[in-house]
Amino acid sequence: MAQVHCNLFSYSLGYPVDIEVILPSFTSCNMDMPHTHALPGKFPVIYLLHGYGNDYQAWLRYTSIERYAEEHRIAVVTFSCHNKAYLNAPLGENFYDFLNSELSEFVENYFPISANPQERYIAGLSMGGYGALLHGLTNLERYSAIGAFSPGIPDENPKEELNKIMRIDLYKVTREALASGKQLPDLFMCIGDKDFLYERVTRYHKTFMPKWHNSRYRYDDLPNYEHEFAIWDKEIQVFLDWIRRKDVYKQMGKNKV
């Protein structure tokens, strides 16, 4: 596994940003095999979003995402969003624009990462789950699947506290995506029944699950989990097994790590 840290100036943000790129590579179990000398193709990729109060390191430190990515032969990209909910903010901090275009421009040009939307996925936890839903549903042809782990979903009440951070209404965005008639990304959501966001996520699920069309939808309601990395470490593995893939690395089967 290659883990690459990048610090680059962002034209969307107006200052440098930290990015971590995980690239599958060979292990002691497949040392000196042909594909370790010449890649059979570009890697599929998951853009993995952190939650409120975290940064690009959270998924790397508190889950085994690096090992899971190696096993599934898939690249992972993380970056720091500074509690801005993956939205454009005042004073030029355009995190929506950064994730929507600049980040993929960089990694797809500098690394062996696929630019094929069918090999591009987006997922996140908490605030990052909100970001994954927002970006996946406002760019219907950009991602093959969305993973929303205990997502921060504000109520439709405009005075609700979460709306101060997550300013774009996910209910409105989702209704517009459904009304577009376009193919929707596959959607994976999960929540623990002890999570403080449980009622919000359950309400969103019950509102839109029956209306999801032409795509797969999975909802995991797990007992005895709160808002914690224990559930996210568990469910990211399920998500990696669940997403639809036709790339050459999927055909090679799981890697032994």
Model segments located where?
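Non-catalytic cap/lid and distal C-terminal segments of serine-dependent acyl enzymes
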Residues: 1-257
